[in-house]
UniProtKB/Swiss-Prot annotation:
Secretion signal, residue range per the UniProt entry: 1-18
A Pfam family it matches: CRF
Residues that bear Isoleucine amide: I108
GO molecular function ontology, one term from the record: hormone activity
Family: Belongs to the sauvagine/corticotropin-releasing factor/urotensin I family.
Species the sequence originates in: Camponotus floridanus
Coiled coil: 83-108
Name of the protein described by the UniProt record: Diuretic hormone 44
Amino acid sequence: MILLGILASTTIIGLTSSAPLSSYERRDVSDNRPKIFLLMDERIPELENEILGNELGSDVTRTKRIGSLSIVNNLDVLRNRVMLELARRKQERDQRQIEENRRFLENIGKRSVPVSDAGKIVRSDKSRNDRNQPLQFNRIEWIEEEDPLFRGSQDDQMTRVQANELRLL
């Protein structure tokens, strides 16, 4: 029974000495600081500066100690890695969009090329090596002079020119 009494009194003394700060003592602690400081009996400025030194807006540099792990530091590292990964994915997505736009712009608007420039476009496309060969082949095939549609339009022009010359004579 005596042992139980000693244990109970020790527990009560321990609980009262480790009680959180009273409202009077809390007035010195600002609201933007972590609430963990309210659990301590005494203020330890070195500990507060070390813990608060890792916040995003602070310019305080913290020296690394071997063998110590910090939850805040690990979260900063993970946050930086996630941000770098998101930036990398966005860059890849933007690069793919740029490539798709480039391919689209190479194919669009090439069908309305004047007849006099058709040979130049065919030669410049054939001399260029691009990894998008099927797209170039379709464009070249449409513009080439051996194309029956292209040859037919030339024949129509020649017929009209000859008819105009005959009228003038």
